[in-house]
Amino acid sequence: MTNIFKDSRRDLRERAFQTLFALEFGGEALDQAYFAYTYDKPIDEETEVDLPSFLLSLVTGVREELPQLDSQIEEKLKEGWSLSRLIMTDRTLLRLGLYEITSFEETPGRVAINEIIEIAKKYSDKTSAKFINGVLSQFVTDEA
């Protein structure tokens, strides 16, 4: 049975993750976001779909701030580790989580982290979820 997302912020974060992950392989951001948003929705080719602004903000924001996000994440990794050493899923989730923590003041940092952890549990494993929690928590602690 197909899971039709309800456009909650949690669902849109997951769609943003799917979009950003797909963009690692190439393509246009808007095309990838459209696909991630609509692939499991019962729509026909003639239906015009407006992508939610939260989804677009996450995707475009991460893409625009990628070098800064990567630099900030690299600073928090243990010695001997780099972003290139991480699996693509974890790298994408760290970028998405950090972007929301630093750019969406209306979202408490801990909420953003918990949401990313739930996505990590679905698309990665418990070890990755703990790792992502550990890295992103450093940004929330630093801001407090």
Swiss-Prot record:
Family according to the record: Belongs to the NusB family.
Role played: Involved in transcription antitermination. Required for transcription of ribosomal RNA (rRNA) genes. Binds specifically to the boxA antiterminator sequence of the ribosomal RNA (rrn) operons.
Cellular component aspect of the GO annotation: cytosol
Keyword annotations of the record: RNA-binding, Transcription, Transcription antitermination, Transcription regulation
Protein name: Transcription antitermination protein NusB
Entry keyword annotation includes Transmembrane: no
Entries under InterPro entries matching the protein: NusB-like_sf (IPR035926), NusB_fam (IPR011605), NusB_RsmB_TIM44 (IPR006027)
Gene that encodes it: nusB
